C-alpha cells in the first residue's frame, strides 16, 4: 500500500506503508543509530514524535520482548529507508512491520531519508504527518491536504511527562542494599537494570510525587529519569524538585532529569534546531579532560551561561556544538548529565556514572552514622 509523508512546509514524500494504516501527526525528528531501533521506538523520550532513522536498513535483527525500554511504542510514527522483511537473529521473535502493527504505529518506507534528514538539519525539526488515506500531492485532494496541513502546523507536544509517567509506585529488587528512589519522568527500563545489577533496591515513583512522599520512603539516593517534551512545561515537577533537593539526599539526574534540575536551580533551557538523537555524540568532561562517546535523545538543552554560579557549574559539554551536557551542583548533593549513561541502544562508556552516584550514596550513609 502507498504511504505519504507530508511536512509542515508542504513537501510530500511518497513511499510504501509499513506497520499500521491511517493518519498520524507528530514532530518529525531524526535518529542516527545503526542499531537499537526497538529501544528507540519504546523509549518514552520520543513521545509525540515521528522518528526518521538515518541508517538505510532497519529491522535486520528483528524484535523481541527483552529489548523493550517500556511496555509500548511511544513514537507517533516511524520513517525508514527500508524495513527488513527477513530478519536474522537467534533472539528474533517478529519483524519490524508486525511489531509496528501490534502497537498500532503508522510507518513509511521507501523514501529518501538522507534528503529528509538534510531538510531537518537545515530547517530544524518540523511537524509532519504519515498517511495512507490519500495522496496529498494529487490536486484532486487539495481540500483534504489543506485541512491536514492546518492540523500539522497546529500540532504541539503537550503534557508529555503527565502522559508517560507511571500511575503508582513500583519496587524492584526489594532485598537490595541501597534504596534508590527513581523519579519516573519517562523512565527507560535500563536505568532500573543498571541500578538493580549494582545491588540496589529501586522504588519507581510517579513524576508528581512530592518531597514529603519521597522523604517517607527513607531513600539512600534519588535518581531523576529521562523523559519527553519541553522541560519548562511541567512546572509542578520543577517546584517539587526544589523541595526534594532540600532533603540533601544524593541525587543523580539523566536527560530530562538534568534539565528539570537546572530549571529548579534558576537556569534556562532552549530548544535545539534539530536535537541530539543517536549513539555517537561526543561529550568532553572538564575534570578529566576526556571525551566520551554517548547515547543521546533530546531536543532541548540547558543554557549553561544561565546557571547561577552559586548553584553549580557546567561539568561536561558536547564536543560538536558546545551545549551543556552535565552539571555539578554546589548547593545540592547532586550531579546531572544530559546524555544516557544507561545507553540501550548505544555505547556504555559512561555507565561508570552509576558507580559514582552509588559512591556518593555510600559516603552519605557513612557520614550519617
Residue ranges and their predicted role:
Residues 175-180, 288-291, 329-334:
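Beta-strand-turn-beta hairpins that frame and shape the catalytic cleft
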Residues 1-212, 216-217, 231, 344, ...:
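RNA-binding accessory domains that recognize and position tRNA/RNA substrates
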Residues 290-331, 369:
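Catalytic beta-strand/loop cores that center a nucleophilic Ser/Cys/Thr
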Residues 216, 220-221, 225-301, 346-364:
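Cysteine-nucleophile active-site neighborhood
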Residues 106, 179, 250-252, 268, ...:
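Proline-centered loop/turn at the N-terminus of a beta-strand
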Residues 326-368:
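A glycine-centered loop/beta-turn motif at secondary-structure junctions
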Residues 179-184, 294-295, 335-339:
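Active-site-proximal beta-strand elements of phosphoester/diester hydrolases
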Amino acid at each position: 500500500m502507498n504511504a505519504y509523508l507530508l511536512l509542515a512546509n508542504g513537501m510530500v514524500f511518497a513511499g510504501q506503508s509499513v506497520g499500521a494504516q491511517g493518519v498520524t501527526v507528530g514532530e518529525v525528528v531524526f535518529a542516527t543509530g545503526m542499531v537499537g531501533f526497538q529501544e528507540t521506538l519504546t523509549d518514552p523520550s520520543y513521545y509525540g514524535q515521528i522518528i526518521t532513522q538515518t541508517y538505510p536498513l532497519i529491522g535486520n535483527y528483528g524484535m523481541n520482548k527483552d529489548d523493550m525500554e517500556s511496555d509500548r511504542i511511544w513514537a507517533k510514527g516511524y520513517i525508514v529507508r527500508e524495513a527488513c522483511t527477513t530478519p536474522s537473529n537467534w533472539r528474533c521473535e517478529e519483524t519490524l512491520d508486525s511489531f509496528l502493527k501490534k502497537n498500532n504505529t503508522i510507518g513509511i518506507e521507501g523514501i529518501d531519508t538522507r534528503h529528509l534528514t538534510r531538510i531537518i538539519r537545515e530547517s530544524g525539526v518540523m511537524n509532519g504527518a504519515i498517511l495512507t488515506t490519500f495522496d496529498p500531492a494529487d490536486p484532486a485532494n487539495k481540500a483534504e491536504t489543506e485541512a491536514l496541513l492546518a492540523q500539522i502546523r497546529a500540532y504541539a507536544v503537550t503534557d508529555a511527562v503527565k502522559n508517560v509517567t507511571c500511575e503508582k509506585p513500583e519496587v524492584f529488587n526489594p532485598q537490595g542494599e541501597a534504596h534508590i528512589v527513581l523519579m519516573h519522568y519517562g523512565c527507560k527500563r535500563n536505568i532500573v537494570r543498571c541500578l538493580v545489577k549494582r545491588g540496589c533496591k529501586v522504588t519507581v515513583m510517579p513524576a508528581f510525587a512530592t518531597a514529603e512522599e519521597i522523604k517517607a520512603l527513607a531513600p539512600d539516593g534519588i535518581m531523576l529519569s529521562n523523559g519527553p517534551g519541553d522541560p519548562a512545561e511541567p512546572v509542578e515537577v520543577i517546584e517539587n524538585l526544589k523541595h526534594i533537593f532540600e532533603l540533601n539526599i544524593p541525587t543523580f539526574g539523566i536527560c530530562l532529569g538534568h534539565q528539570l534540575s537546572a530549571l529548579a536551580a534558576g537556569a534556562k533551557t532552549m530548544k535545539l534546531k534539530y536535537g541530539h538523537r543517536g549513539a555517537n555524540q561526543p561529550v568532553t568532561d572538564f575534570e578529566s579532560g576526556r571525551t566520551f562517546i554517548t547515547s543521546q535523545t533530546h531536543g532541548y538543552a540547558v543554557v549553561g551561561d544561565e546557571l547561577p554560579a552559586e548553584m553549580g557549574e557546567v561539568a561536561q559539554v558536547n564536543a560538536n556544538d558546545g551545549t551543556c551536557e552535565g552539571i555539578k551542583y554546589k548547593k545540592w548533593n547532586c550531579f546531572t548529565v544530559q546524555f544516557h549513561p544507561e545507553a540501550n541502544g548505544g555505547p556504555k562508556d559512561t555507565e561508570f556514572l552509576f558507580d559514582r552516584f552509588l559512591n556518593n550514596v555510600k559516603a552519605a550513609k557513612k557520614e550519617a552514622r
